[in-house]
Amino acid sequence: MESPCRTITLEKNGTSLEPVHYSVQGKEILQIFKENFQKEDPVLFLDGTAGEGGHSFLFLKEFPNSRIILCDRDPIMLSRALTRLSDFSERVVSIQTNFSEINQKLLTSYGIDQTPQGILLDLGISTFHLFHSGRGFSFRESEPLDMRLNPNSGQSAEEILNIYPKDRLMNIFYTYGEERWSKKIAEVIVETRKQNSISTTFELANLVSKIIPRKFWPPGRHPATRIFQALRIEVNQELAHIENGLKLLLDLLRLGGVIQVISFHSLEDRIVKNSFRDYAKQNGFELLTKKPILPSQEEIDENPASRSAKLRILRKTKSVDKKYRNKNFEEEEE
């Protein structure tokens, strides 16, 4: 999934197309794959967070004999990605699923009898979701509090706000949003919903704004930002999917293959960092990034939303006995 970023307008056959989105750290990601695979290699890529298809476009263009497995939990995003990749349709297999559900049995059911050599996860929320989906990911407009990346499954943010008990809401806001005012916000939500349900982004944003004293508002950010992040993570179970998905994908990755993951906040990055570190200790994987690769200043200037991106990379160097997989290791200092 491509993260929030600037838009560019493409043309096809002389006709202007709908603006599409700039792929965060696209140059760096492509360069890593170029260093590990030859241009003419029949590489099988897996884009576990297809988004608008921007990263996949780069891979298919650079590696003319490659194929790609395109996955996204949102059917609308998958459709948009397929439209963007229409020139490569014979080399694309699309699967509407969360990357945490990808395994060899699923791939085989789609006629894929190989394992991927190059895997990408872009964990950022897309510009489409934030500003064009109408699902309440942003408080720029008054929208229903949905926040589901797959609009056809799971509880909405509105249901969570109006059903969950106070202590559970407080824990969500504190754990996923690192919000110091979590207790007070949860208390006010519970009292407010006794009179009227909280159902729109404006209602929630205004409620939070009134609770947090202005002197404690984060510089340059709306005071409800952390609450919206926490709700989105809970609605979509994002952290659990990252943890479980990495286990499946690292086991699935072909010998000699490379997995690259872009994270956008500390909760995501901590899971990726610890998972990659633990697998590297098994001697079946090589950590290619002791420290994450950050966006260049040029990219940040061009696309300020990329500022928080962190890219981590792992290569599979040999098969790992199942009994050693997902083993817990002594924690290194954070």
From Swiss-Prot:
Location (main, coarse): cytoplasm
Binding site for S-adenosyl-L-methionine: 53-55, 72, 99, 122, 129
Superkingdom of source: Bacteria
GO cellular component terms attached to this protein's record: cytoplasm
Annotated InterPro entries: RsmH, SAM-dep_MeTrfase_MraW_recog, SAM-dependent_MTases_sf
E.C. number(s) listed in UniProt: 2.1.1.199
Places the protein is found: Cytoplasm
UniProt entry tagged with the keyword Membrane: no
SUPFAM superfamilies associated with the record: Putative methyltransferase TM0872, insert domain, S-adenosyl-L-methionine-dependent methyltransferases
GO MF terms held by the record: rRNA (cytosine-N4-)-methyltransferase activity
EC top class, as a word: transferase
Family: Belongs to the methyltransferase superfamily. RsmH family.
NCBIfam families: 16S rRNA (cytosine(1402)-N(4))-methyltransferase RsmH (TIGR00006)
Protein name: Ribosomal RNA small subunit methyltransferase H
Annotated organism of origin: Leptospira interrogans serogroup Icterohaemorrhagiae serovar copenhageni (strain Fiocruz L1-130)
Gene name linked to the record: rsmH
